[in-house]
Amino acid sequence: MTEAVPTDSVDSKASSQVNSAENPFPVRAVALRIAGWIDKLGTVWVEGQLAQITMRPNAKTVFMVLRDPAADISLIVTCSRDFVLRAPVKLAEGIQVVVCGKPSFYIGRGTFSLRLSDIRAVGIGELLVRIDRLRRLLDSEGLFDPRLKRPIPFLPNMIGIITGRASAAERDVTTVASARWPAARFAIRNTAVQGPNAVSQIVEALRELDRNVDVEVIVVARGGGSVEDLLTFSDETLCRAIAACRTPVISAVGHEPDNPLCDLVADLRAATPTDAAKKVVPDAAVEQRLIEDLQRRSAQALRNWVSREQRTLVQLRSRPVLAEPLRTLTTRSEEIHRAQSAIRREIIRLVTTETERVGHLATQLATLGPAATLARGYAIVQALEDGTQTVTAAVLRSVDDAPTGTRLRVRVSDGAIVAVSEGRADGP
């Protein structure tokens, strides 16, 4: 509401002055100018979330704060008490509304506000349309891409939990997780889970836990509720904060039918907070049974292996070569001895045969040779050179080969005789 003060003289004086460091405008002049500009704006329609409603007893004016969750910007709106009582919707902090009002500037305190003339609640259908529009936007940017999902550690060192203070969701996660894995540790951050401050508090808690090196997984948990109750978890700022986390995030908001956008951005969706507890830590009893089963299977596998190897050894030892290892050597030794004896006998036989053959040939040679002929009374006659014992020609075969006076060498069986030819003899 613009404060009514006499401004003509002040405004005209300020307008006639050249504004500078030497000629500054007084505060009232500036405030009046701003008030004049704002008065010319007319009425505007504005959408936002009711963050605060202040209705003091006996006060005629009600002050409210209209907030834009996506930008964390607020605007003061005012209306009469009767306007609130006659409003077509039940005004409560956290609801999304569309208001119509006249901008005004209160000169006394230099504050800007919006004087309401109409207010309407944003319908569920419209909320769903906006959520779907945001879903398509985030999907087009790749925030739902399965390839970007970070794996949940099998056994996290510490579990970060963001949930309402003393809520059933907190109790479900911690109780079930501790029952499944008694050594589980938690870093719990209690925040508003609906209302005007929910988004900023959850985003701040997310960033704090993401910076904590001990926290290896973060669970965002809330129980079920209406579309309006869960609107916080379809907020664009929160969705982008989850996508920016380096730590894996599990969304456990609402119940099975609920599907806020943070479910799609998170690395893993849990149907309920209890389901999140089951997914964030293994069941110690199940793991113990698994280990025991693996131990039994390993022991049985080892026993089976030993049995197979024992049977193999028995089979190998039952083979003749291993049952009586010297038998093969003895057999081979006997074969070698037999071969040696056979070779020796064959060599003796061959030597004997060849000796006999040589003796037979020697006998034949002796029988057919000249010595045997001489022994039977024959003689070999050869001519000698004069005055020497040197044989000059071959064996004489004709009387013409030994004319008279030829010196001759006559070989008989036991020696040789030198003679002189006296010519041809009569008779044969």
Swiss-Prot record:
It is an enzyme of class 3 (hydrolase). Its EC number is 3.1.11.6. It comes from the Bacteria. It catalyses: Exonucleolytic cleavage in either 5'- to 3'- or 3'- to 5'-direction to yield nucleoside 5'-phosphates. Keywords: Cytoplasm, Exonuclease, Hydrolase, Nuclease. InterPro entries: Exonuc_VII_L, Exonuc_VII_lsu_C, OB-fold_nuc-bd_dom. CDD domains: ExoVII_LU_OBF. One of its GO terms (molecular function) is exodeoxyribonuclease VII activity. Pfam families: Exonuc_VII_L (PF02601), tRNA_anti_2 (PF13742). The keyword ATP-binding does not apply. This is Exodeoxyribonuclease 7 large subunit.
